[in-house]
């Protein structure tokens, strides 16, 4: 369970409700408007049976439409995923969960996003920076998309400022955990 993974590294036990409340309050302080969770069964998307991610209800706005609540949004989206239901029960798959999200509709980008996430995890949740592991996009040669060196540098700076040395490891497969 994702919440357990987060909780076992905190200074004190936090419920899912407390994590949600703290996240939304943190984002509100950063100028985000809190929007409600969309319906679990999408109203205007005939391509899917269920809302399966936090971004799914926001796709029109991520593609350029103007959102009535502004350019900074935050939510706790209820999600249901059935496409990998055979995998439920391992350490990576679940069917129903809430996805916390903060969304910039052309307002800010990686630098603010990464710093805010790091501050939320370390200052609000109480995670030790030494216990946080991050990933960066390694690129896709076939698609001609380069490695994201910018995000790697941003994370490196945040960890270095707190005296945490970084390491680089290849991502394991699901079978390897």
Language-model segments: residues:
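Short, positively charged and aromatic/hydrophobic N-terminal segments
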Residues: 4-10
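Structured aminoacyl-transfer and RNA-binding surfaces used for tRNA recognition/handling
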Residues: 13-177
